[in-house]
């Protein structure tokens, strides 16, 4: 447990951030660019799409991107049609609010990704295969994003998660080969990310806030 019993702990630390750093938009843009933009960002687990043709739309991105299992493996790609920017996978034309489904299989659309608006059709790796009534198929493929797979955990970004977390991934509890994905929960929280990390990194709150874990 953290040693907080000494009065010196209550003095202002030299490294304490100014209050404005939690609210300044320019600071936030720098954080997104220099911290998150240069990190390995967790996207999801490969068990979200266990079979070829399976897709999973990223709800925390409002279905703007999706994981798709192709013959080459798991792909992360844009889920927005290049023609009129419609959401494709997960779009329910019979639902009053449109895109609602989170996952499925492409066998429902002949093994391809098909836009519900004008039927533009893309392959499982995002290549545009056809555009109805166009004399030639435009060169307008879906944007794809490189993924790094570590024990089934999928990351995007320039850093190598296997190198950053080598000791962590060597532990037996990170072997998910015999697991089956049950469900995914998404919690959207309205607070500064630094506040969450600061609380997460101290264990003073564990006893009263997480009974049984202290």
Task: Name every feature range the model reports, one short phrase each.
Residues 5-19, 177:
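Short, contiguous pre-domain boundary segments
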Residues 48-159, 166:
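Rieske [2Fe-2S] iron-sulfur-binding domain
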Residues 25, 62, 191-194:
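A structural signal for well-ordered alpha-helical segments within the folded catalytic domains
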Residues 21-60:
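Non-catalytic accessory segments flanking enzyme active sites
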Residues 1-7, 29, 211-214:
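Peripheral, non-cofactor segments flanking catalytic/redox cores
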Residues 68, 78-79, 146-148, 153-214:
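C-terminal catalytic domain of Rieske-type non-heme iron oxygenases
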Residues 36-40, 86, 205:
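Generic structural signal for secondary-structure transition and capping sites
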């Amino acid at each position: 447990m953290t040693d907080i019993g000494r009065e010196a702990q209550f003095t202002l630390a030299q490294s304490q951030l100014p209050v404005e750093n939690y609210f300044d938009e320019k600071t936030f843009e720098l954080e997104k660019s220099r911290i998150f933009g240069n990190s390995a960002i967790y996207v999801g687990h490969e068990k979200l799409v266990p079979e070829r043709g399976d897709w999973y739309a990223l709800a925390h991105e409002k279905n703007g991107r999706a994981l798709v299992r192709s013959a080459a493996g798991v792909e992360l790609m844009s889920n927005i049609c290049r023609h009129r920017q419609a959401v494709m996978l997960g779009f329910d034309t019979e639902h009053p609010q449109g895109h609602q489904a989170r996952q499925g299989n492409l066998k429902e659309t002949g093994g391809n990704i098909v836009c519900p608006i004008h039927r533009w059709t893309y392959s499982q790796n995002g290549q545009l295969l056809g555009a109805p009534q166009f004399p030639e198929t435009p060169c307008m493929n879906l944007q794809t994003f490189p993924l790094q797979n570590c024990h089934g955990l999928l990351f995007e970004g320039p850093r190598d998660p296997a190198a950053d977390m080598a000791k962590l991934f060597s532990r037996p509890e990170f072997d998910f080969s015999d697991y089956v994905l049950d469900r995914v929960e998404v919690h959207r929280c309205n607070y500064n990310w630094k506040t969450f990390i600061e609380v997460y990194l101290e264990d003073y709150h564990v006893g009263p806030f997480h009974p049984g874990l202290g």
